[in-house]
Amino acid sequence: MKINLLARKYFSITLNLLNLAPPFWLKDFRYFVVVDYHYFTDNKISDPTLEVDRLILDKQLEFISNNMNPINPKSFDHKAFFRSKPIKPSILITIDDADFSIKRNLDIFEKYNIPLIIFVPFGLCLAPSTYDGLRSRIFRSFFEIKENQQEVEGDIKFNFFEKIMSSSLEELEEIYIEIKSKRNNKDIISSRTLLNFDELEELSHHPLITISSHSMSHPVLTQVPKKWLMWEITSSMQYLRKVNGDEKYFAYPYGYKGSINGEVKELLRKNGVKYAFSTRSKTVKMNSDFLELGRVG
């Protein structure tokens, strides 16, 4: 908690505390750091681990603009980067969850000409009147029931997935009403207003913005059966292509060590992902695992 608070108030100090700035950068700038934002606000902060005040965001981006080399994901290639000799420390900005607050604060990124990746949980951005929009909200709600966050037998999850995928729209609406009433450990993403599909398509044409996948329903990918996992990845990639997004980037939902394994990484690789991001604090170096890159945030 202390590190997260410092990260949002004293950005440069935090980089030093996490050993993500000098001495590494003073010796060789062929490292870079990836920053992970979630939500922005100009009101009282309710969750200091995920929200950043608009004024603080402005100060952070001003610092980055003056002292660092912001990486443009539209043209990034790690081989070219590590062959180069950057004269400043480099940084890549990412934002998880496609929260509507991005749109309200985009002017600050434009002010400092800072490129960014928005990682989108596509199913939660679809209208709840659509099949995949309803399915994703039901799957999200399933994991907001405490007992389903524990070790649940694979057959239970598999059968639940099969039931949802074979249900009619009317049946899905009834299931959603019922499962919503059972939620007793609601995730913050379910209380946020996310960008809708049309807004994502519009933003994808912005010169500073790259749209990429964050799955469909934002589950811990290692906790779902293989067929469910495949749906989370392949369906999100289909919607990603519809909004002119970039499939080579992906952010793991939650992103802690146990949310990533070889099966998930292999499926991402097969779907064109070259760079996948966790939430673990690590610099990106030439010998990094590019399907398990670290981020600060």
Predicted regions and their residues:
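C-terminal active-site subregion of NodB/CE4 polysaccharide deacetylases
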Residues: 1-94, 100-102, 206, 223-297
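Metal-dependent polysaccharide deacetylase catalytic core of the NodB/CE4 family, i.e.
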Residues: 35-41, 110-258, 292-293
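Short alpha-helix within the catalytic core of nucleotide-sugar-dependent glycosyltransferases
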Residues: 103-110
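Generic enzyme active-site microenvironment
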Residues: 94-95, 212
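Alpha-helical segments flanking ligand/cofactor-binding loops in enzyme cores
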Residues: 107, 201, 265-266
